[in-house]
Amino acid sequence: MNTTVAKRINFQNEYKAKHSDKPIMLFRDMDFYFTYNEDAEPVGHILGASGKVAHAEDFTYAAFSARKLDEYIPAIIRKGYHVAICDGAIC
């Protein structure tokens, strides 16, 4: 696992430990949003063929184009999830 992914997963775990609503975490990386581990499967299911779910050696992730954020956030929320977006240097 590369250090960026490890930092994001760490941040995700810490954030979820502090927030009882356990939001789906979306991390911006250039032109894509990524989500990891337990968040990847529901996001992939909600987005269907538009979302990519992949299994790396030691983590699972889903990704989608940043251009689709305004379309996908409501779809995720309609399924009953909360969403937190990390779009900056701390991520």
Predicted regions mapped to residue ranges:
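Basic, polar low-complexity surface loops/patches
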Residues: M1-C91
